[in-house]
Amino acid sequence: MAKVCQVTGKRPVTGHNVSHAKNHTKRRFLPNLHSHRFWVESEKRFVKLRISTKGMRIIDKKGIDTVLAELRARGEKV
């Protein structure tokens, strides 16, 4: 399963671990993803999304119906 937020599109980025001796080793910074069920009142059903915590805040602000409309406009199956 891809580590990508369905709402924001956040995905892993690469960087370095830096030791005290300034040695750099490659690492990945992963987004803070959660599988979360949202109740959609207009459809009378739950929708399960894999979203970041930033995505949860966006849903709190805009509302689940607006966010689902944007996802469907992008062609994502929800």
UniProtKB/Swiss-Prot annotation:
GO biological process, one term: translation
A Pfam match: Ribosomal_L28
UniProt xrefs under InterPro entries: Ribosomal_bL28, Ribosomal_bL28/bL31-like_sf, Ribosomal_bL28_bact-type, Ribosomal_bL28_sf
GO MF annotation list: structural constituent of ribosome
Residue numbers spanned by region Disordered: 1-22
Keyword terms: Ribonucleoprotein, Ribosomal protein
This protein's GO CC annotations: cytosolic large ribosomal subunit
Keyword Ribosomal protein attached: yes
NCBIfam families: L28
Family label: Belongs to the bacterial ribosomal protein bL28 family.
Protein name from the UniProt record: Large ribosomal subunit protein bL28
Phylogenetic placement of the source organism: Bacteria, Pseudomonadati, Pseudomonadota, Gammaproteobacteria, Cellvibrionales
